[in-house]
Amino acid sequence: MTQNVGFCAYTDDFTFFMDGGVESWAKSPESVIECINAAAEEVSSLEPDFILFQEVDFDSTRSYHIDEQEILRAAFPQMAEVDAVNYHSAFLMYPLTQPHGSSNSSMVTFSSVGITGALRRSLPISTGFSKFLDLDRCYTISRVPTENGKELVLFNVHLSAYGGSDEIRAAQMNMLFGDMLAEYQKGNYVVCGGDFNHDFTGNSTQVLNGGEMTDFGWAQPFPAEMLPEGLTRCDNYTDGKVEP
């Protein structure tokens, strides 16, 4: 199970300033707590063995310094956990009407069985202004032993949205796919989930916007042609269809 909780700001009426919207902070502290609890409840209802969260804030201006990590830990107390900070900004004085402020955000992986090792891998990012909203992009690699001596290797990823030249996107994909392929070639089981910041299915902007195609600029088509042999993607979550 994977979910980007969006620093627990995205109520139905929230519009983020970097997507052409208005707000740079969540609506209120109460709204943040309500959103993180709702996310935890929804995920818990599905009883997943593995959970991959992105944009989990702690001590951030935009989410009123609420520790969303601690709330998730309390919701899944029996699960093993791996955290990695992938967004740290001392203070962003933009937008001027409501500065984004200081930000700390992480990716959190939960597992119902023990994790024997984990690694954080830094991704290449833009060097322009957008890097101030795209700091420390990374993915985590978590290792879970199996009965046959192989490992289940979980990749929790959050790729760039706003940085995004074609070169940066390609470099991030090549790095991720290279690490996944290396594990697959060792005979390990490999699962990758997270926020790719791409149009993963080919019609995701339409599905998520009431049937209307919407151009977000950053939601480029997922480069399925870059997938190495042996790796597949699931692009239809209803019937479990897997497309090579």
Positions of predicted regions on the chain:
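Conserved beta strand-loop-helix elements of the APE1-like EEP
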Residues: 74-77, 101-118, 145, 243-244
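Active-site beta-strand/loop signature of hydrolases that rely on acidic residues for catalysis
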Residues: 2-5, 38-65, 110, 142-144, ...
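A SAM-dependent methyltransferase catalytic signature shared across enzymes that methylate proteins
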Residues: 73-82, 111-119, 221-236
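Surface-exposed cleft-lining segments at the edges of enzyme active sites
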Residues: 22-29, 56-58, 123-131, 158-169
